[in-house]
């Protein structure tokens, strides 16, 4: 079956995709509590339980001197050691066994999906719903990735969207490439991040037992799934050297996953084009999408954060959307939310680059 036909088949099978259209109704729910497919204003979406990932243009940075940077030396030392170990791991690549390459790819993809399909599109934005087996899979992948637990990751990400490019944005790209890439993890949070972050509604995350279970046991979970397991499996099962297992399969793989995610915060906010909203910093960056499983269509994502594809195009350089659609085909994902073509074209005309031809 041709790829585009397969995509249509999977996208329409077993579950519904809610289409967001435009304009002009503000009705979000019917009497039975189900989401309606009614036209909405472009700035609105149909997630009545989720409003805190929508950009708030009324928030402005406070005037006056900026607070002094407070370095977190523990993080600086640990990140430096991690990247030194990862660099050494690169030199070991030619000496690794084929099963180790496969293991690293498997572990990388599991961790990536735990971030992209899990912490990002499911828990931060509620762009689709997942049944328990899929949620467990994504929680495990998220723990393997070790980029903060789902609760903290989602809280920071919602703040990033709502207060984007301000002092309340945890990785504000206006503070430079290095800060938005990794520097924000090496210093104390700006007071505005804590102040505005505390105003976010996180009740949906607190109410989810699986998310809170992961948060409660996150440290031992990370120790086991991010460091011990990926090191011991190659060493024990196919007699890989301990050196290769530690520095390549574990430290290099972990550092690679971190930096690819960080590029969404840094490169995808600085380099690329802005077809959907030229008034905001996030850009469409194909190279970032290649590494980050489809997360580089960032101008679209910040314009329509409620679209489960995080892109106008579902499977185009977007492994995460392919994965979610496959999960929908077997009944594990449902209620995927997708912005309509009419809404996209209207938004391009209003705030985007009119020379851009929507596909």
Swiss-Prot record:
Cofactor: Fe(2+)
Cofactor binding annotation: Expected to bind 2 Fe(2+) ions per subunit.
Catalytic activity field: octadecanoyl-CoA + 2 Fe(II)-[cytochrome b5] + O2 + 2 H(+) = (9Z)-octadecenoyl-CoA + 2 Fe(III)-[cytochrome b5] + 2 H2O; hexadecanoyl-CoA + 2 Fe(II)-[cytochrome b5] + O2 + 2 H(+) = (9Z)-hexadecenoyl-CoA + 2 Fe(III)-[cytochrome b5] + 2 H2O
Stretches assigned to the Cytoplasmic side: 1-72, 119-217, 264-359
Protein name: Stearoyl-CoA desaturase
Assigned protein family: Belongs to the fatty acid desaturase type 1 family.
EC number(s) reported in the record: 1.14.19.1
Gene Ontology cellular component annotations, sorted alphabetically: endoplasmic reticulum membrane; membrane; nucleolus
This protein's encoding gene: SCD
Phosphoserine: residues carrying this PTM: 198, 203
Record keyword Oxidoreductase present: yes
Domain notes: The histidine box domains are involved in binding the catalytic metal ions.
Residues annotated for Fe cation 2 binding in this entry: 160, 269, 298, 302
Topology relative to the membrane: Multi-pass membrane protein
InterPro entries: Acyl-CoA_DS (IPR015876), FADS-1_CS (IPR001522)
């Amino acid at each position: 079956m041709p790829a585009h036909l397969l995509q249509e088949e999977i996208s329409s099978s077993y579950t519904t995709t809610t289409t967001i259209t435009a304009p002009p109704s503000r009705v979000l729910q019917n009497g039975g509590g189900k989401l309606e497919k009614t036209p909405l204003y472009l700035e609105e979406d149909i997630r009545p339980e989720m409003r805190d990932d929508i950009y708030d243009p009324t928030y402005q940075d406070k005037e006056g001197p900026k607070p002094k940077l407070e370095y977190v030396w523990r993080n600086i030392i640990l990140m430096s050691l991690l990247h030194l170990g990862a660099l050494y791991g690169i030199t070991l690549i030619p000496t690794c066994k084929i099963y180790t390459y496969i293991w690293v790819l498997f572990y990388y993809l599991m961790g990536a999906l735990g971030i992209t399909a899990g912490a990002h599109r499911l828990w931060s934005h509620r762009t689709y719903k997942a049944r328990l087996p899929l949620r467990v899979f994504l929680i495990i992948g998220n723990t393997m990735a070790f980029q903060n637990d789902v609760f903290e990751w989602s809280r920071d990400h919602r703040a990033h969207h709502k207060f984007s490019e301000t002092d309340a944005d945890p990785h504000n790209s206006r503070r430079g490439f290095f800060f938005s890439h990794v520097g924000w993890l090496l210093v104390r949070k700006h007071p505005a991040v804590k102040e505005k972050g505390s105003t976010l509604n996180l009740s949906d995350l607190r109410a989810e037992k699986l998310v809170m279970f992961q948060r409660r046991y996150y440290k031992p979970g990370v120790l086991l799934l991010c460091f011990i397991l990926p090191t011991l499996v190659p060493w024990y099962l196919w007699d890989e050297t301990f050196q290769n297992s530690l520095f390549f399969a574990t430290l290099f793989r972990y550092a690679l996953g971190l930096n690819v995610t960080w590029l969404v915060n840094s490169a995808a906010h600085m380099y690329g084009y802005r077809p959907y909203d030229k008034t905001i910093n996030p850009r469409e960056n194909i190279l970032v999408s290649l590494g980050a499983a489809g997360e580089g269509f960032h101008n679209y994502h910040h314009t329509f954060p409620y679209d489960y594809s995080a892109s106008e195009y579902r499977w185009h350089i977007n492994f995460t959307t392919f994965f979610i659609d496959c999960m929908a085909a077997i009944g594990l994902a449902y209620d995927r939310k997708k912005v309509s073509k009419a809404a996209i074209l209207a938004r391009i005309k209003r705030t985007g680059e009119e020379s851009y031809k929507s596909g």
